[in-house]
Each structure stands twice: as C-alpha cells, then as structure tokens.
C-alpha cells in the first residue's frame, strides 16, 4: 500500500479532470503469440451498478504488456464467480489458459470499497484435481484485499496487473508508471505543451505551455521531478520541475546549447550537453550547487548523454568517427570507447535498467529504427519497422520501449517490446507528439 499511496498522491496533485485517454493505444503486432490468461469481471456485491469495471483495467494492462492475451469471457467455463471458493478446477481443463484472475468489490463505508482478488494457477489446479480433492493453497498464487476510494479504482487495477505480471513472469510490472512527452499544436497561440500521463495515456495533464519549443523531458530516479529544455526565454535553457509542488528551477543557462539533460542514478546531478566552450560537449552539473564538470573534450560534436545504472559511466552520441555513433566514457578515468559499429548511424542510446542491453536509434539504408544491442555479445537487433524513429525511452522493468515516430505524416508515439515481438502505436487526438520519457517505478 505504501507504493500505491505514493503513486495516488502524485496522481491527485496532477489530475484535475476525469480520467480519459488522450493517447489511444492501437496494438499493431504481437497479440497472437501472447500467453493465454483468464480475467473474470470482478463481482459487485453492492446495490446498483459497480463504480468501475476494475477487471477491464487489468485486461487492458495485460494485453498492452505484449506478454498475455486475455480470453473472451463468453468462452470461459464458469461465469459470475469472484472467489477461489467458487472455483471448480475440473471445469477449466479445456480452457488452455495458464492462470485465472477473479475478484469481488463491495461497499465499505462512505466512498470506500473493499476490493478482493485471487490469482489461480490453472495448470497446477488441473494437475492437482486429477489426484483428487485438494486445498486451494495448492494452486493459489496470490490473494489480497484492499480498501480504496472510488477515485482509486483505476490505479488499483494497475496495481493488480503489476502483481499478476510479476507472479507469472518473475519481472516487476510497470503499469503504475507514467510517461512524459511534448505535444505540438500549431493551431494554438502557445503550441508547445509539456504533458504527463499514465503509461497508457490516461489522465493526461499539462505541466507547462509555451509559445517557444519545449524538448527532452526526462524523469528523476524518484519520479518526483522532470528535467527538460525550454526556449521560453528565446534561448535554450534547462529546467527541473517538481511534480508535487510545481516549483521550477533553472539549472543551466549558459551561452549556446543547453540540451539533452539526463538525471544521475542518485538524482543529484544532470549529464547535459553544453557548447559554451565551443563545440557541443558532455558535462555533469550538480543540481543544487550548479557546479559543473566537463566530461568530454573533442573537436567533434558530443551530445545525448545517458547514464549506466551504476552511475560510473555515461554513453553519448559523437561524430568523432566521422558519423554519429555511440560511445562510452568512464567517469573515473575519462577513458572513451566506441560501442556501436553496425549500420550507418547509431544515436540516442540508453542502457536498460538491468545494465545488460542498450536501446538506441539505428540508421541502415537510410531508415531510422529503434534497435537493441546485447552489451555482452554485441548482437544488435532492429526492433521496429516504422519510419523516422527517434527518442527511445525504456520502461523501468526493461520490457518495453516508447519512442517517437511518424505515422500518416504526423509525429506520434509508439511502443515496442525489447524482444521486438509486440508493437503498438499511440496516436494523439490533436497536434503532434514527440520526446517521450518513461518514468521510474512510482
């Protein structure tokens, strides 16, 4: 509940309008190969209609993970069951799903509801049933109940999805996370908008509107702040904004380029690109003291820094080899090594949270696509087949990448799993959308 309460506190501060999806997720590839799972509508145990369909949130999350495919409720052998006590293992022998999610919702005081859910291992339940009557503890993977308010239904649905996903895959779910991005709508006087939304595009909220460009939003490790570049004062400047207090702090306003901020793993510093001394170079700036340290020193352009999870190295894009490629610099020694070699260009890299892979933009035969490279084997896999892909950002559990692309002549967001199997598009209703950034776990 501590994690849920923290997320809900942020959601309440940001949300001033009813939940809605400004970015509708359109799945384009990968559902057929997903793992079958059964999610029953949660049984409402109160008068009138249920406040919200919490199971719909869970089903949508599991589909969007690219890992699971919820079965059609009409084909399930049992209907209107909400507890493990009502579950009949023998009835599910021909379903083919690996797990079942079911639950109940009932009033629990003024604007309070008790939500209970069970996660059943169907394979184990059926195997045990062949041996005779067994206790539910033999196949019950998880069972929880929580009191929530009406405003918390959607968020708690995401929490259930996180639990189910982790129990079945061993990987922490990332459904209680958010994304930030920039919307550009030139029909408005101030066309540039810095936005934050739930990972699925719901609860979109505007943090800043400007007549001048906004770009490169990035999250702090605690999920409390965003750093971004603003041209509101007719020049590039880097700001850090607290999402709870809305307080903005100008961190960097040197002559020339101030760009590509990236929070250090401890949240105390930003790696940034500055051109105050000539060519664009990589620097680290202390957010509190504004003290800066130059990291690279080369006649070529160095930009787009990103941290290794251990905070001991940075990767960055450089033209020092003649074309944009990704390099690594060790902060203790200053040693620089080239990381990418395949294709014509490689740029905009970031390291996955487990430190095992790098996600970046690869240009081959003139096409810009999102790619992944295993840092041990150096094997590179192109993940996308969209066009003009840019700005990849990795989910905190390392399973998905959100990025900018072009669709039907407009800049939109898209997502791809890090194995390249699942793909989705997030078209916006109005304007163009770019510069996505996925939050840490909240």
UniProtKB/Swiss-Prot annotation:
It comes from the Bacteria. One of its GO terms (biological process) is cell division. One of its GO terms (cellular component) is periplasmic space. It is found in: Periplasm. Keywords: Cell cycle, Cell division, Periplasm, Signal. Residues 1-21 form the signal peptide. Pfam families: PD40, TolB_N. Part of the Tol-Pal system, which plays a role in outer membrane invagination during cell division and is important for maintaining outer membrane integrity. This is Tol-Pal system protein TolB. It comes from Shewanella baltica (strain OS185). The lineage of its organism: Bacteria, Pseudomonadati, Pseudomonadota, Gammaproteobacteria, Alteromonadales. The gene is tolB.
């Amino acid at each position: 509940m501590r994690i849920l309460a923290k997320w809900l506190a942020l959601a309440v501060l940001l949300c001033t309008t009813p939940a809605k999806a400004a970015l509708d997720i359109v799945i384009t590839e990968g559902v057929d190969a997903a793992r079958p799972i059964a999610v029953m509508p949660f049984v409402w145990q109160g008068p009138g209609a249920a406040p919200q369909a919490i199971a719909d949130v869970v089903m949508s999350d599991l589909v969007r993970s690219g890992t699971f495919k919820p079965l059609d409720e009409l084909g399930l052998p049992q209907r209107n069951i909400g507890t493990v006590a009502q579950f009949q293992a023998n009835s599910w022998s021909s379903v083919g799903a690996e797990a079942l999610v079911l639950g109940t919702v009932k009033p629990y005081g003024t604007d309070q509801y008790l939500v209970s859910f069970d996660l059943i291992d169907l394979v184990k339940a059926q195997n045990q049933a062949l041996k005779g009557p067994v206790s539910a503890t033999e196949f019950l993977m998880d069972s929880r109940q929580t009191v929530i308010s009406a405003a918390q239904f959607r968020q708690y649905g995401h929490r259930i999805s996180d639990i189910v996903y982790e129990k079945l895959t061993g990987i922490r779910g990332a459904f209680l996370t958010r994304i930030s991005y920039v919307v550009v709508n030139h029909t408005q006087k101030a066309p540039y908008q810095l936005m934050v939304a739930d990972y699925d595009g719901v609860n979109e909220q505007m943090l800043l509107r400007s007549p001048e460009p906004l770009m490169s939003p990035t999250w702090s490790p605690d999920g409390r702040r965003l750093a971004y570049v603003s041209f509101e004062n007719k020049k590039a400047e880097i700001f850090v904004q607290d999402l709870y207090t809305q307080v903005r702090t100008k961190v960097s306003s040197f002559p020339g380029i101030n760009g590509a901020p990236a929070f250090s793993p401890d949240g105390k510093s930003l790696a940034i690109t500055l051109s105050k001394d000539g060519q664009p170079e990589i620097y680290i700036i202390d957010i509190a003291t504004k003290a800066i340290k130059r990291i690279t020193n080369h006649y070529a352009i160095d930009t787009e820094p990103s941290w290794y999870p251990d905070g001991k190295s940075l990767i960055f894009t450089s033209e020092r080899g003649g074309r944009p490629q990704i390099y690594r610099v060790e902060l203790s020694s200053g040693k620089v090594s080239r990381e990418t070699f395949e294709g014509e260009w490689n740029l905009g890299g970031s390291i996955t949270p487990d430190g095992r892979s790098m996600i970046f933009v690869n240009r081959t035969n003139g096409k810009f696509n999102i790619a992944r490279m295993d840092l041990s084997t150096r094997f590179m896999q192109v993940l996308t087949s969209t066009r003009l892909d840019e700005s990849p950002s990795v989910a905190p559990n390392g399973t998905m990448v959100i990025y900018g692309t072009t669709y039907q002549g407009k800049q939109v967001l898209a997502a791809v799993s890090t194995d390249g199997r699942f793909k989705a598009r997030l078209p916006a209703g109005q304007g163009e959308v770019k510069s996505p950034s996925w939050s840490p776990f909240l």
